[in-house]
């Protein structure tokens, strides 16, 4: 008896119930009044009294299994029927939408090219915080106490220091990174320092209150201004082309001596004069010079033994030069029409 019950249970579990016809055949064979389950219950009276509780339990489990399979099949078939009757919300005949393909921002593209050029010259990359203390941003770079760059009109101060509390500001250049490198490392040093900088300037076609800057520092024995010029010329030729024209002008920076500014022929007018170059025919691309002895001393480097040069350039202005863009504000406005022009 027990073997027959287990065999019937196996048949119930394996019976296919994917159609209404299969479900009806299942009922007729197992669950109706004259079906197999009822017939097995009828034979319970012939079982020995000692075995009746166990066999009765097996029969009840068999009946529950059969009824459960019937109810599950009914629910599944009803759901399938309803889904066929309801119209689909998905119209497979509609044309698909093309996914939007982004591209590298021109500032990041040019900055990456700059890094590659200087990496090939042996420069490594150094970074530092954008929120800086006045000591690193001004004092150790040989800025005079009354230098105009320290004024509120030129610098975004987060907190003005007093007593032992230092000034806290948004860095106006990446030169503080050079200070940190010189304090932490011993010469020879050859690094570039890319990053965002902030200045309290009027926004115009040529200037913005936040921009990207890349500075370089090289300290070694017997470094000369000729080494600096060779580096600048090599960079400019790789960035703007071998026929680029440069102009070095004497200038003043507190942290370099002697100092110079480097101009390149205006990309819009070709040197004839326009509103972008203010009718001069030239555009400034960077400032440079030999590291001031006071800066070296402030960082614990003996200027009698070591010398070096430094330079700094605006990455955004280089983007304007390279792609002939006449307004720096376009780089920060997130106008997708402009950005789509730089797809690879």
From Swiss-Prot:
The positions making up the signal sequence are none
Ordered alphabetically, the record's keywords are: Aminoacyl-tRNA synthetase, ATP-binding, Cytoplasm, Ligase, Magnesium, Metal-binding, Nucleotide-binding, Protein biosynthesis
Q: Where in the cell is it found?
A: Cytoplasm
Annotated gene: pheS
Instruction: Please report the name of this protein according to its UniProt entry.
Output: Phenylalanine--tRNA ligase alpha subunit
State the Pfam families in the record: Phe_tRNA-synt_N, tRNA-synt_2d
Q: Which CDD domains does the record associate with it?
A: PheRS_alpha_core
Recorded E.C. number(s)?
Answer: 6.1.1.20
The enzyme class is: ligase
Its subunit composition reads: Tetramer of two alpha and two beta subunits.
Task: Tell me if tRNA-binding is a UniProt keyword of this record.
Answer: no
Would you tell me the Gene Ontology cellular component terms? cytoplasm
Entries under InterPro entries matching the protein? aa-tRNA-synth_II, aa-tRNA-synth_II/BPL/LPL, Phe-tRNA-synth_IIc_asu, Phe-tRNA_ligase_II_N, Phe_tRNA_ligase_alpha1_bac, Phenylalanyl-tRNA_Synthase, tRNA-bd_arm
Q: Which reaction does it catalyse?
A: tRNA(Phe) + L-phenylalanine + ATP = L-phenylalanyl-tRNA(Phe) + AMP + diphosphate + H(+)
Name the PANTHER family on file.
PHENYLALANINE--TRNA LIGASE, MITOCHONDRIAL, PHENYLALANYL-TRNA SYNTHETASE
Give an example GO molecular function: tRNA binding
**Cofactor, how bound (note):** Binds 2 magnesium ions per tetramer.
The entry sums up its family as follows:
Belongs to the class-II aminoacyl-tRNA synthetase family. Phe-tRNA synthetase alpha subunit type 1 subfamily.
Where Mg(2+) is bound, by residue? 257
TM region(s), chain numbering: none
Q: Which cofactor does it need?
A: Mg(2+)
Q: Which GO terms describe its biological process?
A: phenylalanyl-tRNA aminoacylation
């Amino acid at each position: 008896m027990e073997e027959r019950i287990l065999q019937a249970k196996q048949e119930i579990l394996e019976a296919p119930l994917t159609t209404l016809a299969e479900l009806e055949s299942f009922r007729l064979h197992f669950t109706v009044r004259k079906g197999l389950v009822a017939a097995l219950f009828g034979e319970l009276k012939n079982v020995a009294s000692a075995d009746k509780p166990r066999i009765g339990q097996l029969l009840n489990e068999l009946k529950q299994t059969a009824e459960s399979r019937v109810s599950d099949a009914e629910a599944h078939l009803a759901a399938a029927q309803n889904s066929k009757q309801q119209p689909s919300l998905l119209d497979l005949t509609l044309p698909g939408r093309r996914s939007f393909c982004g591209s590298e921002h021109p500032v990041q593209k040019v900055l990456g090219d700059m890094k590659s050029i200087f990496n090939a010259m042996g420069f490594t990359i150094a970074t530092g915080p954008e929120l800086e203390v006045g000591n690193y941003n001004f004092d150790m770079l040989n800025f005079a106490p009354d230098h105009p760059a320290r004024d509120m009109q030129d610098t975004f101060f987060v907190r003005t220091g007093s007593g032992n509390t230092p000034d806290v500001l948004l860095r106006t250049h990446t030169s503080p990174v050079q200070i940190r490198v010189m304090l932490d490392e011993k010469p020879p040093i050859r690094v570039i320092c890319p990053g965002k900088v902030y200045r309290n300037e009027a926004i115009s076609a040529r200037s913005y209150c936040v921009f990207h800057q890349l500075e370089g520092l090289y300290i070694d024995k017997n470094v000369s201004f000729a080494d600096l010029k060779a580096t600048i010329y090599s960079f400019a030729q790789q960035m703007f082309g071998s026929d680029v024209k440069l102009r070095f002008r004497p200038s003043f920076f507190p942290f370099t001596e002697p100092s110079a500014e480097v101009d390149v022929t205006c990309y819009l007018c070709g040197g004839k004069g326009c509103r972008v170059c203010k009718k001069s025919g030239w555009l400034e691309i960077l400032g440079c010079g030999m590291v001031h002895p006071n800066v070296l001393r402030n960082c614990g480097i003996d200027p009698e033994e070591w010398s070096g040069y430094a330079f700094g350039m605006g990455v955004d202005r280089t983007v304007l030069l390279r792609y002939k863009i006449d307004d720096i504000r376009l780089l920060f406005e997130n106008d997708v029409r402009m950005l789509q022009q730089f797809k690879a």
